[in-house]
């Protein structure tokens, strides 16, 4: 497979862009080789600068639930373009978008549009702190909430009460206000809350984690978090940037039946355009400026092009509940075929999945938090990634990222993926 053009672009990029990429995982550091530079996409396919074509399972890291080049979304964008790229003023589209989100997600009574998932989570934490008058937050090891300082914290062994900076540039003072617990460990949460009585403003969690691979909440875990937050006057925030509108018309909270106080959103709500949102109870959200004292603003927030794309996809999803059944069935079919291929080789690797999100972990133990996810054989994953790539299948270049199925993945394409998987597994296991 030729990649001379991509290699040349990467060489040029490294001279002017840190690491040659605008988001670290794209650099292929975890899997070796040079990243592929993509020039176009259609349906379930990516095409790189050397004209290699790949069936892809990352959906632009989640947003492209209908596949690439969807005419419904592209028409909405084309129509909006005739009115200007940006107004810097309120527009009809942002009102319609907010009304639609509120109608689809029962826990959200008011919503504010921003430009990214990171902005959404940073803003939600600020609002929770302002609303409660408390400063500390609890997050979960392995959950990713964007690159805000408060979230770049990881707990070392046994460090359940004090965060440590996980990136140079994160002040120790910020780290001190971010407490971490293992995902799915409700007792660790109870201990943190008890040791920091009346100091916790918010608990933020991915209700389905996607950035340590796909990791699901244990039965009763989300319900227990809800109970703790109710008892201790803590704002429960679900980060549904990845799972929102991906797992159901109301996201993971619709699947698991637990309502948070606040929700952050992104990815799918922009239909591929850069966008984010945060919302929740009116009692909380009415504290956001200009109706309240908690400041948050953005020049391009509510951008009419992004709103038009988002409206198109959300209206379609709301009107097409059968799509989720289709996506779930196709994901089940794909995983069944992949697992069968593994079994024929005597392999028992762990699959985690819910809806159209899934990960195959290169370990045979159950994966339910970051520590168990890290038991995966990363060298085997890297070899698998390259073997699949050579067969025209583009995966996330990290063991610790969820894969996604779009509606563009037909049974025929799923069979191609299963065949490539079987060949790749045989190759890397000799």
Curated annotation (Swiss-Prot):
CDD domains xref list: OAT_like (cd00610)
GO MF term set: glutamate-1-semialdehyde 2,1-aminomutase activity; pyridoxal phosphate binding; transaminase activity
UniProt pathway: Porphyrin-containing compound metabolism; protoporphyrin-IX biosynthesis; 5-aminolevulinate from L-glutamyl-tRNA(Glu): step 2/2
GO cellular component terms given for this protein: cytoplasm
Enzyme Commission number(s): 5.4.3.8
Pfam families: Aminotran_3
Record's keyword annotation contains Iron: no
Required cofactor(s): pyridoxal 5'-phosphate
Keywords: Cytoplasm, Isomerase, Porphyrin biosynthesis, Pyridoxal phosphate
Segments forming a coiled coil: none
Keyword Transcription attached: no
Transmembrane segments annotated in the record for this chain: none
Protein's cellular compartments: Cytoplasm
InterPro entries in the record: 4pyrrol_synth_GluAld_NH2Trfase, Aminotrans_3, Aminotrans_3_PPA_site, PyrdxlP-dep_Trfase, PyrdxlP-dep_Trfase_major, PyrdxlP-dep_Trfase_small
Reaction catalyzed: (S)-4-amino-5-oxopentanoate = 5-aminolevulinate
Catalytic EC class: isomerase
GO biological processes: protoporphyrinogen IX biosynthetic process
Family: Belongs to the class-III pyridoxal-phosphate-dependent aminotransferase family. HemL subfamily.
Subunit architecture: Homodimer.
Matching HAMAP family: HemL_aminotrans_3
Protein name, per record: Glutamate-1-semialdehyde 2,1-aminomutase
Species for this entry: Cytophaga hutchinsonii (strain ATCC 33406 / DSM 1761 / CIP 103989 / NBRC 15051 / NCIMB 9469 / D465)
């Amino acid at each position: 497979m030729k990649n001379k053009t991509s290699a040349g672009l990467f060489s040029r990029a490294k001279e002017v862009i840190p690491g040659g990429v605008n988001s670290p995982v794209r650099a292929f550091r975890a899997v070796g080789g040079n990243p592929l530079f993509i020039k176009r996409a259609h349906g379930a396919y990516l095409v790189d600068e050397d004209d290699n074509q790949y069936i892809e399972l990352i959906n632009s890291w989640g947003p492209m639930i209908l596949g690439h080049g969807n005419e419904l979304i592209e028409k909405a964008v084309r129509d909006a373009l005739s009115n200007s790229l940006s107004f810097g003023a309120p527009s009809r589209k942002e009102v319609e978008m907010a009304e639609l989100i509120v109608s689809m997600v029962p826990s959200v009574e008011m919503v504010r549009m921003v430009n990214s998932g990171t902005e959404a989570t940073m803003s939600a934490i600020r609002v929770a702190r302002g609303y409660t008058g408390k400063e500390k937050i609890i997050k979960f090891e392995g959950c990713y909430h964007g690159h805000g300082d408060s979230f770049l914290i990881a707990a070392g062994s046994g460090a359940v009460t004090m965060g440590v900076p996980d990136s140079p540039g994160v002040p120790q003072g910020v780290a001190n206000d971010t407490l971490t617990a293992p995902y799915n460990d409700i007792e660790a949460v109870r201990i943190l809350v008890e040791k920091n009585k009346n100091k916790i403003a918010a608990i933020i969690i991915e209700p389905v984690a996607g950035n340590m691979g796909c990791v699901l909440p244990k039965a009763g875990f989300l319900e227990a978090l809800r109970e703790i937050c109710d008892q201790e006057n803590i704002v429960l925030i679900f980060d549904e940037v990845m799972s929102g509108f991906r797992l159901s018309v109301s996201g993971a909270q619709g699947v698991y039946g637990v309502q948070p106080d606040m929700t952050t959103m992104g990815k799918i709500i922009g239909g591929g355009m850069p966008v984010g949102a945060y919302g929740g109870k009116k009692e909380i959200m009415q504290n956001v400026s200009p109706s309240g004292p908690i400041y948050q603003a953005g020049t391009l927030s509510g951008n009419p092009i992004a709103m038009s794309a988002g409206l198109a996809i959300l209206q379609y999803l709301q009107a097409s509940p059968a799509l989720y059944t289709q996506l779930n069935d196709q994901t089940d079919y794909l995983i069944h075929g992949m697992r069968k291929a593994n079994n024929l080789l005597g392999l028992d690797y762990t699959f985690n999945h819910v809806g159209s999100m899934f990960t195959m972990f290169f370990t045979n133990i159950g994966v339910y938090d970051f520590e168990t996810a890290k038991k995966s054989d990363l060298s085997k994953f890297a070899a698998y990634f390259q073997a699949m790539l050579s067969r025209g299948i583009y995966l996330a270049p990290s063991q610790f990222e969820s894969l996604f199925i779009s509606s563009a993945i037909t049974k025929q394409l799923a069979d191609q993926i299963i065949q490539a998987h079987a060949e790749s597994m045989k190759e890397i296991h000799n």
